[in-house]
Regions:
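A short acidic, Gly/Pro-enriched loop at the edge of an enzyme's catalytic core
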Residues: 91-100
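Conserved class I S-adenosyl-L-methionine
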Residues: 1-35, 38-46
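Conserved SAM/SAH-binding beta-strand->alpha-helix loop
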Residues: 67-69
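Conserved beta-strand signature within the Rossmann-like core of class I S-adenosyl-L-methionine
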Residues: 123-134
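Conserved SAM-binding loop
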Residues: 74-75
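Conserved SAM-binding strand-loop segment of SAM-dependent methyltransferases
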Residues: 78-90
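Core SAM-dependent methyltransferase catalytic element
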Residues: 169-187
Length: 187
């Protein structure tokens, strides 16, 4: 990721104009319980809303993000959260370490195989991000490489046992947006 991305996200997290939810993602609330307790990884954690929820549920959590400003919102709030400011375009995820991996509203296809390897046996992946849909024109444009293609998320994690998958409209940025959601277990 470019330094410009770090600057952009730091600016967004420091701005009072941008409002980021403090509530955990619905998909995390609905499926975290499938994972054995242990260490969770929150990729592109932003303000840490999902990590803080998981700590309340008994997990220790490692959070990764490009933005120091975003990580400051979660770092130090609980000793079970460890934050690391990293460039996910070059960072390598530790293999066979996590009982739960979250990837919410972020896409880096290079990480797909690493995410599979990061899970311990019985570990759970919860992944949800934006989807390019031919019948939808967003109010806020996204770069095509930041959008999943139809069925791409499902096909990207065939090594795991998929327990939930959907492609549907969901709320994002105050408007409906096509999202792909996946929950899968490493057997």
């Amino acid at each position: 990721m470019l330094n410009s991305d770090r600057i952009k996200w730091n600016r967004k997290y420091r701005s009072r104009r941008e409002v980021f939810s403090a509530h955990p993602s619905d998909i995390v609330c609905n499926f975290y319980h499938l994972a054995p307790h242990g260490c969770a990884l929150d990729i592109a954690a932003g303000n840490g809303r999902n990590a803080l929820f998981l700590v309340q549920k008994g997990f220790s959590v490692e959070v990764l993000d490009i933005s120091e400003a975003g990580l400051k919102m979660v770092a130090g709030r609980d000793p079970k959260v460890r934050a690391a400011c990293v460039d996910l375009d070059v960072y390598d995820i530790v293999p066979r370490r996590y009982s739960l991996v979250l990837n919410i509203r972020y896409l880096n296809r290079r990480l797909f195989p690493q995410i599979c390897e990061a899970l311990i046996g019985g570990g759970v992946l919860i992944f949800e991000t934006y989807l390019k849909h031919p019948n939808f024109v967003p109010q806020r444009p996204h770069r095509d490489d930041h959008l999943l293609r139809i069925n791409e998320l499902l096909l990207g994690f065939l090594k795991l046992e998929v327990v939930y998958y959907s492609e549907k409209m969901a709320a994002a940025f105050g408007e409906p947006y096509p999202m792909a959601s996946l929950v899968a277990i490493k057997r």
